[in-house]
UniProtKB/Swiss-Prot annotation:
Species in which this protein is naturally found: Dictyostelium discoideum (Social amoeba)
Residue sites binding Ca(2+) 2 per the record: D109, D111, S113, Y115, E120
Protein's name in the database: Calcium-binding protein K
One Gene Ontology term of the molecular function aspect: calcium ion binding
EF-hand domain ranges (all copies): 60-95, 96-131
Gene field: cbpK
Keyword Ligase appears in the UniProt entry: no
Lineage, uppermost ranks: Eukaryota, Amoebozoa, Evosea, Eumycetozoa, Dictyostelia
Family: Belongs to the recoverin family.
Length: 192
């Protein structure tokens, strides 16, 4: 559980950047130690991370979970430390909607081109449909919510695909899309 401590400065930095209280931070550190202890290695392995988040994102496929792990492993060392873990929980649960949508775009921009190409949009639509079904929306409604934000009218250069800015602008204007992916202030599922 090596990387399970934060310096006083790191705690203060996290408190400034998030809505977490000092008590929240302490509880998150305790929970991190428990969740990251299963393989006796330092930090949160990819397997532990996926196990932890798969419960909360049961409709997500393995490749998307691996991509999420990679995005949160900010130092690229293959292990999520406590600071990266707290950041992940904040982004998924308490961050402003625009930040969450930016993360969602990055999650599906698998080639890091800055654009969502057709295959990436298809994966995004599939996740939205699965999330929508899990929340009781009809398949048609969930498809409509996803397709409405990724339609050609929102894309300046159709050859390149949908840019990050275009995605965030379009998605943030669709209350239904935001609800389906659980990125509204009162989350539909507890991440933490």
């Amino acid at each position: 559980m090596g990387n399970s401590k934060l310096s006083k400065e790191e705690k203060e930095e996290i408190i400034k950047k998030t809505k977490y209280t000092p008590e929240d931070i302490e509880q998150l550190i305790k929970d991190f130690k428990v969740a990251a202890a299963s393989d006796k290695k330092s930090g949160f392995s990819q397997e532990e991370f996926i196990k932890f988040f798969k419960v909360r994102f049961s409709n997500w496929d393995e490749a998307s979970m691996v991509r999420m792990f990679t995005l949160f492993d900010s130092d690229g060392n293959g292990v999520i430390d406590v600071k990266e873990f707290i950041t992940a929980l904040y982004l998924m649960a308490k961050a402003p909607t625009l930040d969450k949508l930016g993360f969602f775009f990055d999650l599906f921009d698998s080639d890091k081109s800055g654009y969502l190409e057709r295959e990436e949009v298809d994966k995004l639509v599939n996740i939205v449909v699965c999330c929508g079904k899990g929340l009781g929306y009809s398949i048609n409604d969930a498809i409509d919510y996803a397709v409405s934000i990724t339609s050609c009218r929102h894309i300046a250069d159709y050859q390149k695909g949908m840019s990050r800015e275009e995605f965030i602008k379009s998605a943030s204007q669709s209350e239904n899309f935001v609800k389906v992916i659980c990125f509204y202030e009162s989350p539909c599922m507890q991440l933490y």
